[in-house]
Amino acid sequence: LFISHKLNEIMAVADRCTVLRKGKYVGTIDTAKTNKQELSNMMVGRPVQLEVEKSPAHPGEAVLEVEHFSVPSKLHKKDAVHDVTFTARSGEILCIAGIDGNGQTELVYGLTGLEKPSGGTVKLCGHDITHAKIRERGKEMSHIPEDRHKHGLVLDFTLEQNMVLQRYYETKFQNHGFIKADAVREYADGLIKQFDVRSGQGPITVARSMSGGNQQKAIVARELD
C-alpha cells in the first residue's frame, strides 16, 4: 500500500490508484490507462493546469536593495553571509540558490531582523531598515519562513490566534490591551475562506492538529493579507 499525493511517484510505483478527496472515495483507475492530468483532476475535483505559460517579466523600480551585507555565524567566527549585494525589483521573483547550510538561512534572518547584521545596508522601498525593529519591517515586508514550525506558527495556539500574531496590537483587534475576540474571529474566517485553509474546527482549530499543507496555507494567508 503506497499513499502519496505526488503524481510522478504514483505513476512510477503503483499499478492501481484509488483517489480520496475530503475523506470520500472518488474512483479507482489503472495507472497504465491514465495520466498525471486525469489523476490531478480526480484529486482536486476540477481541471488542473500542470504547466504554466509565463510571459516575459518587466521588472519595475527597486523594492529591496541589499549592499555589502554581512551576517555573523553562530557556529564560528567567520560571517555566515559576507559582503552580499543584490536588488529585487517590483514585478519579479528573485531566487537565491545554494546547498543547505551555505548562508541562505542567515541571510533571511538578517533581512527580516531575526539576526543583527555585522555590516552593510538594507533598503526597503527606499527606506533604510538595516537596524529597524521587526515590527517596523513587518509593515512593508512579509516573511514566509523555511521552517513553519519554528518561525511560522505557535503550534499550540488556535488558527485565529496565529492569524493575528503580528497584528494583535492594532486597534482593530484590541482595546486598551483587551483582545476583540469577535474582530479576530471575523478576520480569521475571511482569510480561511479566501485561501481555502482546511481545518477540523475552523478558526478555533489548534494549529498543531492541522496538516502540513494547511499550516503552510495559513502562514501564506497571514503574510499576503
Where are these regions (language model features)?
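Glycine-rich phosphate-binding loops of nucleotide-dependent enzymes
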Residues: 1-225
